[in-house]
């Protein structure tokens, strides 16, 4: 991978990370088209740190409030009984606990299925299938859902279900935001609430995955045939951070006015295009280096 290709992939990451269209699927597809090979799970996870840093910058006030209120309640600022320590009556502390609960599924499944995630699940036929299926689900759920729940209405049950939706994004093509937004809309949350919860809930998962893959890349970069090198990876990460911040602003404005129908149609169209490219042999279903590792 050269630096121009890294810039392109950084742009692709920034444009698709927050939208319910699956950034990992786009990185996988564009990587194959430009490089002739899969950039790999490590590259994908590391450059996602860039887009998640943009999330932290944009939501910095919410994050500071969540952390200060959560720690304050935990250490007895609002009372010594367990309900007070769990954030009773404190919306930010409660949101902090909900984010923790919502992170449980992806942590368990991420560690349990790590080898499968990095090999078998990167098959583009799987990507095509989930692009199509979750595109239809997003379309139907968004059109039929109630729109009366806000972030203050979240329960631990809802948080866990949000987390299950997020954990589906371990499969390239599902989309982290697509999974959580679809679950959120099905549970009756407004579009704005579903998106904000999706952003905040992704922070622990993305940073955890990114830091884990960074450590692995540092240890194995000389022997990992798929890792494109630190120079291009860091360039892509910086590009994804800068452009990602702009995309967040635009996306939040978009969902306050429009439905997710356009994204659902895009997912279905992309699934058809990728399927055709697979059929005619332009794209391989599984990168040879991934197949060898499986």
From Swiss-Prot:
Catalyzed reaction equations: di-trans,octa-cis-undecaprenyl diphosphate + H2O = di-trans,octa-cis-undecaprenyl phosphate + phosphate + H(+)
Pfam families cross-referenced by the UniProt entry: BacA (PF02673)
Transmembrane regions: 39-59, 93-113, 123-143, 198-218, 232-252, 268-288
EC number(s) given by UniProt: 3.6.1.27
Domain of life from the UniProt record: Bacteria
Membrane topology designation: Multi-pass membrane protein
Presence of the UniProt keyword Cell wall biogenesis/degradation in the record: yes
Keyword Hydrolase: yes
Record localization: Cell membrane
Annotated GO MF terms: undecaprenyl-diphosphatase activity
Gene Ontology biological-process entries: cell wall organization; peptidoglycan biosynthetic process; regulation of cell shape; response to antibiotic
One GO location term (cellular component): plasma membrane
Keywords, sorted A to Z: Antibiotic resistance, Cell membrane, Cell shape, Cell wall biogenesis/degradation, Hydrolase, Membrane, Peptidoglycan synthesis, Transmembrane, Transmembrane helix
InterPro entries, per database record: UppP
Known role: Catalyzes the dephosphorylation of undecaprenyl diphosphate (UPP). Confers resistance to bacitracin.
Family under the similarity heading: Belongs to the UppP family.
Note: Bacitracin is thought to be involved in the inhibition of peptidoglycan synthesis by sequestering undecaprenyl diphosphate, thereby reducing the pool of lipid carrier available.
Identification of the protein by name: Undecaprenyl-diphosphatase
